[in-house]
Amino acid sequence: EHKKILTADKHKIPGLRNLSHFTPMAPGVPVPLHYHSDIIELHFMVKGQRKTYVMKGGVRTSYCATGNNLFITRPYELHTTGHIAQNRCEFFAMQLDLKEHDNFLGLNQHYSNILCHRLLNMDQHLYHVGSSQISMLRTAFNLISYGTEGDSIAGVQYLTCVLASLNYLTAVPAQEEINEQLNSDIGHALKYIEQNIE
């Protein structure tokens, strides 16, 4: 299986919706345009590359995350991977529910609020992430996936360390972001042709 998803009803960790690991066995299925209310979505790229498009005011901005990059979408932010299947890549993804801001990851109210505030104030979409953070995230995922209470407690500690370190990350310098007005089906057709005909 090229993906493993740990859902909130299984892991029961406050503030963590889904925690997923996608391996590079098969290209990803295109993700349609959508948003999440009260949820920050994080994609930690291990290897390969993954494009995501963020929509704002009828303008689509393209971001390309590669190995050791973190891509973030914020609550109510429209995003998609486009109409074309993604390249093979490995990444961890998580959805953080900020409605749990008083008990986020089981932290007390004070620290929970601080961590949620820090996450909401990350103002870029793309950041460099260290291999130690990826390693801690992999450990967190493995421990939480075992399903025992003791393993979950240890896994949450690793996950909390990763999330608490994110506000120290350096943003990826502005790429050649593609800003396009989305008012024409012809534009979509031309873009598809340009990307798929050699």
State where each predicted segment sits:
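Intrinsic-disorder/low-complexity regions
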Residues: 8, 67-68, 184, 195
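Amphipathic, well-ordered alpha-helical segments in soluble domains
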Residues: 41-44, 133-140, 158, 162-165
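Polar low-complexity intrinsically disordered regions
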Residues: 1, 59-60, 176-180
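A hydrophobic/aromatic-rich effector-binding and dimerization subdomain
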Residues: 1-22, 78-149, 168-172
